[in-house]
């Protein structure tokens, strides 16, 4: 499995000065893949990047070959590098082992966000981090469209007074919904290589 590090610089007048230079490592869709034995290649890349935050946006496990222990090993090492924030993907919704994964992540110190928000503080200033559960967890998933489910989830979380807001959600195709919630930055996965391919 090839591993590539992409670096992006995000600028916003809404970002508190204390977050200038803040590094976020974004990991998504590992699907229980090991990049190097016990994910050491990936973990070494994370260590070298020295992130301030690690965002994991779903599909840490694969519903066809779920290995909770491998996922927890990766998360346990990642949380030693930087605070980790995790949201679910569609593969977590498809397995009966999600509760074991969630419990293990929490025990390791990973912040699991299921339609919740939290604050990240740095030098006395704060940003809001919102994490939404994948729509496929909803009991209405078969009867309602994903946009309606996501809109409902976000409506309860969004507050225009929250300041700079970072949204973690597995699904990039719901970006039109995210725009309406005033998120300043959205991190998502699911697309395995991008929304646009040439």
Protein language model features and the residues they cover:
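Alpha-helical membrane-targeting segments
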Residues: 196-198
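Hydrophobic residues on conserved beta-strands that form the core of alpha/beta folds
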Residues: 5-7, 27, 129
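Short, functional N-terminal and low-complexity linear motifs
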Residues: 10-12, 42-44, 68-73, 142-144, ...
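Conserved catalytic scaffold of divalent metal-dependent phosphoesterases
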Residues: 14-17, 32, 93-187, 191-192
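Membrane-embedded segments
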Residues: 18-113
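N-terminal membrane-anchoring alpha-helices
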Residues: 1-18
């Amino acid at each position: 499995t090839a591993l590539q590090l992409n670096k992006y610089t995000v600028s916003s007048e809404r970002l508190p000065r204390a977050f200038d230079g803040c590094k976020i490592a974004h990991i998504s869709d590992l699907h229980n893949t090991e990049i190097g034995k016990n994910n050491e290649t990936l973990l070494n890349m994370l260590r070298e990047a020295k992130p301030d935050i690690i965002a994991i946006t779903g599909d840490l496990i694969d519903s066809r070959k779920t290995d909770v222990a491998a996922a927890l090993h990766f998360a346990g090492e990642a949380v030693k590098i930087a605070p980790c924030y995790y949201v679910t993907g569609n593969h977590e919704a498809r397995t009966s082992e999600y509760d074991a994964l969630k419990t293990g992540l929490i025990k390791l110190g990973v912040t699991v966000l299921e339609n919740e928000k939290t604050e990240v503080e740095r030098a006395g200033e704060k940003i809001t981090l919102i994490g939404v559960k994948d729509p496929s967890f909803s009991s209405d998933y078969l009867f309602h469209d994903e946009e309606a489910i996501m809109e409902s989830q976000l409506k309860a979380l969004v507050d225009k007074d929250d300041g700079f807001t970072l949204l973690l959600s597995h699904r990039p195709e719901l970006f039109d919904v995210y725009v309406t919630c005033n998120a300043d930055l959205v991190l998502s996965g699911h697309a395995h290589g991008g929304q646009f391919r040439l």
